[in-house]
């Protein structure tokens, strides 16, 4: 059992430490009486989980990339603990984020998650579900890549919920991508039949909508002593990379260097070269096009960094920051030119 001293803000960049939080009371984590726990146990910490989509490890300034500016992710690095040897186990199809999120949520390995993570059965507890069962208010916003029933078992409330893998292409509305996500409000029945397209003319962005929901939850619970767990799952920097000028910094391809392991075309067919990711640019890859794609990718990372900063600032303003454990992670990485690839359906370092 870990005893967290939260007088000074404690931040973690990986999940294992969070799962050792003593819940207190009649929890299986301790055998003391309820009276003893109330008198002797520290105040139970809040937990904020921030999850980005397709963000490779080398896109954080504090970890040595001087081409990108990520001041709020840097705050987490500089004030917390970084786990630099964690890897994604891949997947059984092209949607790597689906099993990776299911693995993170359940603690199970790739071959043990149900249907590649598409469904999380009742007998496979998620960590938000465990927190909820032990008295935490659990809140979810953003991407949920498994079934709706598992979401409702995990969270007692939520807002701006995106069920699915990515903001798709196809028709005029969908091609606006992050500017026009299809979102749901929390439905206690679990049916979620009344989702709505966000009006693209509002010139908002998916990350802002998820941050707005998180900020509103913090504001609403500022005076509430009951501990909470927040799960904020961004859909950025996953493509389509149509970030608006007002959201973060726009990078110029002239500012970006090509990765040393860039080649114009992968030397052999690994079985996944026809995935949608790999069709974003034609092969053989033209260096100028890859640099432009990397510049857009960096812009998306910077955009989500701005929204993370808004959440951290509100947490501090609420006075909850000194008793909140923050976990920041990505579901998987991404190749953006490395080895001639543009996807994550491989086991190269940038993708895992």
Report the location of each language-model feature.
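Bacterial N-terminal signal peptides
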Residues: 13-24
């Amino acid at each position: 059992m870990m005893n967290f001293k939260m007088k000074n803000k404690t931040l973690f960049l990986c999940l294992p430490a969070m799962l050792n939080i003593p819940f207190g009371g009649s929890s299986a984590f301790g055998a003391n009486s309820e009276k003893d726990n109330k008198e002797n146990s520290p105040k139970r910490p809040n937990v904020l989980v921030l999850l980005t989509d397709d963000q490779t490890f080398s896109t954080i300034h504090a970890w040595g990339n001087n081409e990108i500016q990520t001041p709020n992710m840097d705050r987490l690095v500089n004030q917390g603990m970084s786990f630099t040897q964690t890897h994604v186990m891949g997947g059984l199809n092209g949607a790597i984020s689906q099993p990776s999120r299911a693995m993170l949520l359940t603690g199970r390995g790739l071959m043990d998650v149900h249907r590649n993570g598409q469904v999380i059965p009742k007998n496979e507890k998620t960590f938000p579900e465990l927190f909820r069962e032990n008295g935490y208010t659990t809140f979810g916003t953003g991407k949920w890549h498994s079934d709706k029933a598992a979401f409702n078992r995990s969270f007692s409330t939520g807002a701006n919920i995106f069920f699915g893998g990515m903001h798709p292409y196809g028709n005029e509305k969908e091609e606006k991508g992050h500017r026009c996500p299809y979102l749901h409000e929390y439905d206690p029945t679990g049916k979620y039949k009344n989702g709505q397209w966000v009006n693209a003319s509002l010139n908002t962005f998916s990350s802002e909508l998820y941050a707005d929901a998180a900020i509103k939850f913090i504001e609403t619970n500022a005076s509430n002593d009951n501990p909470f767990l927040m799960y904020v799952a961004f859909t950025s920097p996953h493509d389509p990379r149509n970030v608006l000028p007002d959201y973060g910094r726009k990078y110029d391809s002239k500012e970006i260097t090509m990765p040393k392991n860039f080649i114009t075309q992968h030397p052999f067919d690994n079985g996944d070269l026809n995935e949608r990711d790999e069709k974003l640019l034609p092969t053989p890859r033209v260096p100028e096009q890859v640099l432009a794609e990397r510049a857009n990718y960096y812009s998306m990372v910077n955009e989500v960094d701005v929204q993370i900063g808004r959440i951290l600032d509100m947490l501090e303003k609420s006075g909850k920051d000194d008793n909140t454990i923050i976990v920041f992670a990505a579901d998987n990485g991404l190749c953006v030119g490395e080895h001639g690839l543009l996807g994550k359906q491989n086991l190269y370092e940038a993708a895992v």
